[in-house]
Swiss-Prot record:
Family per record: Belongs to the orthohepadnavirus protein X family.
Keyword Transcription regulation: yes
Record's subunit section: May form homodimer. May interact with host CEBPA, CFLAR, CREB1, DDB1, E4F1, HBXIP, HSPD1/HSP60, NFKBIA, POLR2E and SMAD4. Interacts with host SMC5-SMC6 complex and induces its degradation. Interacts with host TRPC4AP; leading to prevent ubiquitination of TRPC4AP. Interacts with host PLSCR1; this interaction promotes ubiquitination and degradation of HBx and impairs HBx-mediated cell proliferation.
Keyword vocabulary terms for this entry: Activation of host NF-kappa-B by virus, Activator, Apoptosis, Host cytoplasm, Host G2/M cell cycle arrest by virus, Host mitochondrion, Host nucleus, Host-virus interaction, Modulation of host cell cycle by virus, Transcription, Transcription regulation
Annotated localization: Host cytoplasm; Host nucleus; Host mitochondrion
Region entry Mitochondrial targeting sequence, spans: 68-117
Pfam short name (any one): X
Designated name of the protein: Protein X
GO cellular component entries: host cell mitochondrion; host cell nucleus
Keyword Metal-binding: no
Function per UniProt: Multifunctional protein that plays a role in silencing host antiviral defenses and promoting viral transcription. Does not seem to be essential for HBV infection. May be directly involved in development of cirrhosis and liver cancer (hepatocellular carcinoma). Most of cytosolic activities involve modulation of cytosolic calcium. The effect on apoptosis is controversial depending on the cell types in which the studies have been conducted. May induce apoptosis by localizing in mitochondria and causing loss of mitochondrial membrane potential.
Processing after translation: A fraction may be phosphorylated in insect cells and HepG2 cells, a human hepatoblastoma cell line. Phosphorylated in vitro by host protein kinase C or mitogen-activated protein kinase. N-acetylated in insect cells.
Amino acid sequence: MAARLCCQLDPARDVLCLRPVGAESRGRPFSGPLGTLSSPSLSAVSTDHGAHLSLRGLPVCAFSSAGPCALRFTSARRMETTVNAHQILPKVLHKRTLGLPAMSTTDLEAYFKDCVFKDWEELGEEIRLKVFVLGGCRHKLVCAPAPCNFFTSA
């Protein structure tokens, strides 16, 4: 089973943050711009850099109590659809990190809410998720335009 991560939009940094959720606690839900999400309590966030999690290739900041610096992710299958093909999400996100015109924050929120959360939470397709760590992080691992799959089964 893949490790469970909680996603939270950080409007101050205009990024989606992933936070590891410990098996002992799923945290309490909170309502935000992307709907009701699960937010881990501080005790549920690992301080051992995620040694107990079945994740590979994530930067050390992904397991910080403050959350990762700039993790962005999407569903591979949704990126391959004709609707989203012209957007090429990794390139869109990279443009945003450079301050160039790209998809609006509102559009990105809708994209992640409708595509990622549905596939991940409802269908349990963790293996299909791709991780993009772009810009503003000294721990960054850039995977664009050819994304890598960092979610592995335990």
